[in-house]
Amino acid sequence: MIEIKNVSKYFSGNKVLKDVDLKIKGGEIFGIVGHSGAGKSTLLRCINGLETYDEGNVIVFGKDLKQINGKNLREFRKEVGMIFQNFNLLNRKDVYHNISLPLEVWGVPKNEIASRVKELLELVDLTDKIHSKPSNLSGGQKQRVAIARALALNPKILLCDEATSALDPNTTKSILNLLRTINSKLGITIVIVTHQMEVVKGICERVALIDAGVIKETGDVENLFLNPSSEMKKLIGQSDDDVLPKEGINIRVIFPKNSSEGALITSMARELNVDFSIVWGKLERFRDDVLGSLVINISEENKEVICNYLVSHNAIWEVA
């Protein structure tokens, strides 16, 4: 669906995207995370041609964006919707006419516009706000209008640029649920740029970490958060050094979905008759699953027998 090959971009002589490689599958919800200024929004805008790039290729729907221009670029952008942090609604127009605007630009007949706007308002659960002005809407309602407008032309891809950054946690959750519904019902590919880790955990299937214009790693959300690299730890502000004991050996056991590592730990203590301490643990929700990990502290003399036990039971673990 979307393939980015060795893409680089310069601003005023500075290389803001550096040899970026990414593949985003059709129908998935994909996250791009990083600190402010990391290059994530610039990368997102390269996907729909709002930003040009200097090197490499961005291939969408099998077409290289560098080879698309004029009328063909306009047709291409019809297939890619986008929502923003600040909603970008027209304050002088009511909800109906904000949503209908792209349809009007494309010359869709009025009766078809009315039908499509009604359908979209039902999808985003705002039928009672059809004649309201943006000034009379909450932040969450404004974003729902923006989502409806972005979907007006039946795009195959929806790009979300910090779409929940201006919203409170409860409203953010409702918007994420809406996006998941849209993904499920319409099969639309969603690419989300965010610095909010809870957004990634709540909706994304896979995620790429970008820092200073470089893709540091890409993978399943669960794996990147439950067994984070040093780069991911830096992003989420996690440091084991302040938590884990300096004496003994610390072993982290990962709890993926549909696992029984919790029972494994108690069985290990009983069967091996060894002492250890549980020094750190957490449970987190990823989409519909609750996953977690814990760290046990063991003595040097018990290291071999405990590690052999974990290996023999196919546990997911590492020395922390």
Swiss-Prot record:
Domain ABC transporter as annotated: residue spans: 2-237
Gene: metN
Molecular function GO terms recorded: ABC-type D-methionine transporter activity; ATP binding; ATP hydrolysis activity
Subunit record text: The complex is composed of two ATP-binding proteins (MetN), two transmembrane proteins (MetI) and a solute-binding protein (MetQ).
E.C. designation(s): 7.4.2.11
Catalysed transformations (reactions): L-methionine(out) + ATP + H2O = L-methionine(in) + ADP + phosphate + H(+); D-methionine(out) + ATP + H2O = D-methionine(in) + ADP + phosphate + H(+)
EC top class, as a word: translocase
Nucleotide-binding listed as a keyword: yes
Chief place where the protein resides: membrane
GO cellular component annotations of the record: plasma membrane
Annotated membrane topology: Peripheral membrane protein
Record's protein name: Methionine import ATP-binding protein MetN
Tagged with keyword ATP-binding: yes
Top-level division of the source organism's lineage: Bacteria
UniProt cross-references to CDD domains, sorted A to Z: ABC_MetN_methionine_transporter
Chain positions recorded as ATP binding sites: G34, H35, S36, G37, A38, G39, K40, S41
Protein purpose: Part of the ABC transporter complex MetNIQ involved in methionine import. Responsible for energy coupling to the transport system.
Cellular localisation: Cell membrane
SUPFAM superfamilies, per database record: ACT-like, P-loop containing nucleoside triphosphate hydrolases
